[in-house]
Design a protein with these regions (language model features):
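Glycine-rich active-site loop/strand segments that organize a redox cofactor
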Residues: 1-2
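Short beta-strand to alpha-helix junction loop
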Residues: 5-24, 35, 90, 96, ...
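Amphipathic alpha-helical segments that form well-ordered structural scaffolds
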Residues: 17, 21, 25, 100, ...
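Primarily hydrophobic membrane-targeting regions of prokaryotic envelope proteins
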Residues: 20-27, 39, 89, 101, ...
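Predominantly flavin-linked oxidoreductase catalytic cores and closely associated redox partners
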Residues: 28-188
Length: 368
């Protein structure tokens, strides 16, 4: 992608710092308590199971020993259940809400799954001023011809975070030489040029992501009152696209609006509105992954037409910054996909396809 101002601002910090700041601010609120050394093992409900009344807890252990749940809850614990006016499941991909609903006599939501077999590993390196000619990062996308990807981003403390990934279980090795060799197979050598000389600060941390999953809670005709499923507990996206946190933030705004209308049927109301938030990024992720021949799934006419047009968008963006800005806005969910079809952008895409361009699909994060 041609180097130009994208119009976007990115916060490039480590996950640990972000979680520390968020957790600290939440804990500073006088009416919020964070319970540790315990886990939720089920839902508590009325006798007829029509309303969720809390969660069932189980004590766990930490290196500091077992924390007395009864003391920390100060009377809110009834037996093994914590009473609540509203229960929100934000437990992520491992959510057990489908099973918990079944235990209360409700149907499980329909589950859509796209098997992709993404394997990736992240590693930190010492950052030097001359790396990437001073840019703050680079993203190298996977393509059907080379289903490997990489991202290198600046973080606090003078560090780079590098993530290398591949489809169909083809992830990077966990040894230093193998990790660097994997980076050398990417269609651009920018990441490899940095890590082959940079000082590593830790070992590669491998992770596997077998599939993108969407639970269709919006299709359920019945849900218990006072119960909401949220974020990755509804839908988990291929992490290569980096859309999970953006979708969760958008869902938080939807939840705020739903709560302003009260808690009656809050679960179903939120699920229906959240589905509209999820639809676009889900289509982007599923459609993008169906470009790879090894991914199983129905390639409808709509998917084939959209993917064909996006290939032309990528080609045009290599030489036209206006097309690049439009694509990045859609990919980062700050604009709707229709932005790529407005006459000015479409005309630029058509002109761009006349210019025979080869090379990696990359995007650089520059200093501001």
């Amino acid at each position: 992608m041609r180097r130009a101002d994208s119009g976007l601002r990115s916060l490039v910090i480590s996950r640990s710092l972000l979680e520390h700041v968020v957790r600290t601010r939440v804990a500073a609120q006088g009416d919020i308590r964070i319970l540790e050394a315990c886990s939720v093992v089920g839902l508590a409900s009325t006798d007829n199971c029509e309303r969720v009344t809390g969660v069932r807890l189980r004590q766990t252990h930490t290196s500091a020993g077992t924390i007395d749940i009864d003391d920390s809850l100060a009377g809110d614990l009834v037996g093994d259940s914590l009473a609540a006016d509203l229960v929100l499941d934000a437990s992520g991909r491992a959510s057990r809400s489908p099973q918990w609903l079944k235990e209360l006599g409700y149907r499980r939501p329909q589950r859509d799954e796209m098997h992709i077999g993404v394997a990736y590993a992240s590693r930190s390196y010492r950052r030097e001023p001359d790396h990437l000619e001073g840019d703050n990062g680079i993203v190298i996308a996977a393509t059907p011809g080379n289903p490997r990807a990489g991202v290198l981003l600046a973080q606090e403390g003078g560090r780079w975070i590098v993530t290398l990934a591949g489809y169909f279980g083809d992830g990077p090795p966990s040894d230093s030489d193998g990790y660097a060799a994997f980076a050398a197979t990417l269609p651009s050598q920018d990441i490899h040029a940095v890590i082959r000389t940079a000082e590593p600060l830790d070992d590669p941390r491998p992770t596997r992501y077998p599939s993108s999953i969407r639970h269709r809670y919006e299709h359920l005709r019945r849900m218990p009152e006072r119960f909401v499923v949220f974020g990755d507990a509804i839908c988990t996206f291929n992490p290569i696209y980096g859309q999970g946190m953006t979708v969760a933030a958008a869902e938080a705004l939807v939840l705020r609006d739903c709560l302003r209308r009260g808690t009656q049927q809050i679960g179903r109301r939120f699920a229906r509105r959240a589905a509209k938030v999820i639809d676009i990024p889900w289509d982007i992720v599923v459609g993008g992954d169906l470009r790879f021949p090894g991914v199983e799934g129905r390639r409808s006419l709509k998917v084939r037409v959209i993917n064909g047009y996006l290939e032309r968008v990528h080609l045009a963006a290599a030489s036209d910054p206006a097309v690049g800005r439009a694509f990045l806005a859609v990919a980062n969910l700050t604009s709707r996909p229709e932005r790529l079809l407005v006459p000015d952008v479409a005309a630029r895409v058509i002109r761009g396809t006349w210019q025979r361009t080869t090379g990696a699909r990359t995007a650089a994060l520059t200093r501001r």
